Structure formats: C-alpha cells, structure tokens
C-alpha cells in the first residue's frame, strides 16, 4: 500500500514532471489538468509500487482543503511547494480517545494577543515524521449541549515550531509510518487559522470526504494483491485460484465504475 513507502526525492522528481497538484489552479503552481488525467498518473504510480507516501496527503487532500478555505497568503505560501514536491502534510484529526467520535477532540487552541496557543495531541498521524505541516482540528470554544460540533476550528501548523514532539508508532511489520504528535503550548500566529473560526466541523467533514473516497482507495490494493499471490503462490495453485479470481474481478469492476 502507498503508506509503506516514502521518498522525498522521488516526490520532488515527479513534482518537476508536473505530476503533483495536477488539478490545482495554475496561478498557484498547479497544472489545471482533468480528473481523468490525474487518475491515469495515480493508477500508474500505485500499480508500479512507487514511493508516493511523502507527498500523498498534501497532494490528495491538504492542498484541496487550503484551496477551498485558505487565504490568498496561505495559498501562495504553500500550494506551489506542494506542486513542486517540497511540502508534505500530515493529518491532525484523531486523538487517543477521539477516533470515530471526532467531535470529542480535546486538543485546544486558545486565543492570545498575537495569535493562538495550541495544546493537545494527535495520533495515527501518517508521515508526520517527514511532514512540514499538519492541518490540526482543535477546539477553540466550548461545545453547547445542543450541538457538540460547535466551537471547532482548523489550523495550519508548521511542524518545525518549538514544543512539538513527534513519536513513531511501530506497527506489526516493524515499520513506523504512524505517529503520535504532541503539542505543548505551541505558539501559532493568527495567520495559522484555516478557514473560519468555529466552522472546523463543516470543514473537516469536507476533508474527510477527500480522505475516505476516491479511486486511490482501491488502486492501492494492486501491489498488495500481487505480493499476496507471490507469497502464497503454491497454496493458491492448489486451492485458492477462485479466491484470486474473485479479488481480481472485484478490482476490475471497481476500476470500470
């Protein structure tokens, strides 16, 4: 799967080839290519097992989120770096006790004279150890009893700022692409707010639509299926040919939809 292989150098190389930010506006360094053109490039990258993890989140969802809700200053600062493969993002949604119930996040951003003070932690932050930024969902005011989704906001957080600690989480394979990210009274500028204060819930729902959908969800299984067949070739020849055929048929059906 895409998450297992990251190469910043590879990401920069395909950025110079125009294969990142393909559908982004040209005024921000994008290429204004069609969704079909982006699909073709994405399919070839995933089918070949290319090391796409470094730029994946920035190109697939963070860039689009900034284009939709960001200020002109934020767009001009970050989008060209995404399209050139020089700026990587991590996701700052889930917390140790807030996964599916995302409205229960405890990470808090408090207003200061010059901006915000961020405190809390995020977990399962894929690629945070190599990312430059994280879009963080934080509570900026208490939720009401009637609406728990009120009082949430999103922030563009530079992960090189002081008082940010990123700890790798080792999975069953011994790899550490997941992370826990700690924010210990991190000082943010007022320009770090992404979108509108208090409207973070509606914004993050839109971002989740980008994360949880799209052809990448099934395209990334191509290399996994190939490795599965290679690993269990002998036993599959004896009794598993129908299973392999079923999996291939399902992938091809999804591809044709």
Q: Where in this protein do the model-derived segments appear?
A:
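Short Gly/Pro-enriched turn/cap motifs at secondary-structure boundaries
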Residues: 55, 97-100, 124-127, 145-146, ...
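Glycine-rich beta->alpha junctions and the first turn(s) of the following alpha-helix
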Residues: 164-255
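Short Ser/Thr-interspersed hydrophobic loop/turn segments at strand-loop and sheet-helix junctions
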Residues: 18, 41-46, 137-138, 156-161, ...
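Residue-level signal for inorganic ion chemistry
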Residues: 71, 155, 183
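A short core secondary-structure module
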Residues: 119-165
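A short, Trp-centered hydrophobic/proline-enriched beta-strand micro-motif
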Residues: 85-93, 137
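Internal helix-loop-helix
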Residues: 15-86, 126-133
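A structural signal for short hydrophobic beta-strand segments in well-ordered beta-sheet cores
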Residues: 107-110
């Amino acid at each position: 799967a895409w998450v297992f292989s990251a190469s910043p150098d590879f990401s920069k190389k395909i950025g110079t080839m125009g294969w990142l930010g393909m559908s982004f506006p040209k005024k921000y360094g994008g290429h204004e290519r069609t969704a079909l053109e982006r699909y073709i490039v994405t399919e070839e990258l995933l089918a070949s097992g290319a090391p796409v993890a470094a730029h994946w989140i920035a190109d697939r969802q963070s860039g689009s989120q900034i284009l939709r809700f960001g200020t002109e200053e934020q767009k001009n600062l970050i989008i060209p770096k995404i399209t050139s493969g020089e700026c990587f993002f991590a996701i700052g949604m889930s917390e140790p006790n807030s996964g599916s119930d995302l409205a229960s996040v405890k990470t808090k951003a408090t207003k200061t004279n010059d901006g915000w003070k961020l405190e809390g932690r995020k977990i399962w932050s894929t690629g945070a150890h190599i990312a430059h930024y994280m879009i963080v969902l934080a509570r900026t005011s208490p939720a009401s009893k009637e609406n728990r989704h009120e009082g949430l906001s999103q922030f563009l957080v530079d992960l090189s700022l002081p008082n940010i600690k990123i700890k790798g989480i080792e999975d069953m394979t011994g790899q550490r692409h997941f992370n826990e990210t700690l924010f210990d009274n991190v000082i943010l500028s007022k320009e770090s707010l992404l979108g509108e204060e208090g409207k973070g819930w509606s914004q993050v729902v839109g971002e989740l639509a980008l994360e949880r959908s799209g052809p990448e969800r099934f395209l990334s299984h191509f290399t996994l299926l190939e490795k599965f067949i290679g690993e269990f070739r002998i036993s599959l020849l004896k009794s598993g040919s129908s299973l392999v055929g079923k999996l291939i048929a399902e992938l091809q059906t999804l591809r044709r939809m």
